[in-house]
Structure formats: structure tokens, C-alpha cells
Amino acid sequence: MKKYLLLVCALSCIVFAKAKDWTQYVNPLMGSQSSFELSTGNTYPAIARPWGMNFWTPQTGKMGDGWQYTYTANKIRGFKQTHQPSPWINDYGQFSIMPVVGKPEFNEEKRASWFAHKGETATPYYYKVYLAEHDVVTEMAPTERAVLFRFTFPENDHSYVVVDAFDKGSYIKVIPDGNKIIGYTTRNSGGVPENFKNYFIIEFDKPFTYKATVANGNLQENVTEQTTEHAGAIIGFQTHKGEQVHARIASSFISFEQAALN
């Protein structure tokens, strides 16, 4: 009887342990109030699955800045796929996505939006923020090799999503028939193979009414493909108040075909 009671107690403990949500104790923003001059952790909000291939983070720092998110910043310029272990080592294979309204702005300073921490929710598996400049709520939830974005737009005839493949060699292609953007980035900080590329595929659930690509800061409407030092794309559509547009993003260091499988 005594052994039976001990077994019941042990099983009860196992069930309790499995049911407990330990993520409620995790604050991904902790340690992010850091800078080149002073570290309080040198972390960034890494929104990711355990052992995920990619992390996703809101980006407050400039392209190439190792301090890609700092708690004291007041503007977000994109939502970035990252593999960065520390600001000193920096990143590799990064690219970003950003919703904007009004004008199709690619420049990272001009597309940036004010935000406040009271409008921000950060957990290990989900991130949400209100972008005041554009009146857009952005949400993201990652899988092991992909991520799902949800953008809640205002009523606007000129709602856009910017895709920035970053500099140091990149490629982008808009595929309107498939509501899709594909591309690759070669940006890295060393320690990668000579043929290094991070291939990505982005699928939207809303047809495009506007399309443009960007080559080294030069926006070209109705041009759907660029291979250059710094490539990007902007797609757009009309939205009604509260309309939600979803974007599924997957990537691979092997090929576009593998990214589609991921």
C-alpha cells in the first residue's frame, strides 16, 4: 500500500510539472538596456523555439549594429531574422520585414516608427507591438525554421510591407501571382563558407496592388527582381480598419526549395 501511495504521488508530481508553464517567468527584454559603452547584459529579445534555427527580434539599431535592440530606444525600424550570439561577434544571414503606411519608404530611418513599452508584449514564443507612426499592430510567432507575422492595419489606400535583404550582396524577387517574395542575403561577420547564402520565402494572404524593388536605395516601381549590393522589395494593398494581413516566412541556408519545405 505504501509503495502504491508513493507511486501515485510521484505520478502526480510529473503531471503537475508537465502542466506548469515555465515561460511565464521569462522576460526576453531583460538585459537589453545595453550599449557599446556599457553592458547590462548585451541581450536582445530573441523570439524563438528552443533550439530554433532562427531567432526573430524587433530591430531598433541600424543595419549592422550589434546592439540590434536596446530598451531605451524609441523607434523600431524592422523585425529581423537573426542568428546573433553577441553584439561583439555580430550577426549573419539577417534580413528584415516592416509594415508602413502612407508612402512606400525603404530607407531604414524614414520607415522607422515610434513605439512604447506599454504597447509591447514579449514572451519567448510570441511578440506584439503597436507601431504608432503607422497605426499598425505587428505580431509574430516562430516555429523551428519559420515564423508567422500578423499585421493589423488601419483604413488606408496605401498600406505596405517592406522587405530588406540587407547589404553586402543580396537578391530579391516579387512574385505577384503567388502573393510571394523570395530572396537571399549574404550578409555575415566572417566564419562562413565562400558561397554562403540565407534563402528566404515570404508568402502573404492578400494580393498585391503595388509592387516595387529597391537597388542600393533606388526604388523602382513595377520592377520585380534585383541582384545587387543592397536589395529590397515593397509590396502594398488597400486595407480597411482592423484588417489583418498575414505573412509566412521560412528560410534555408541550402536553397529556395529547402526554404519552401521548412
Question: What are the roles of these predicted feature ranges?
Answer:
Residues 20-262:
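Accessory carbohydrate-recognition regions in carbohydrate-active enzymes
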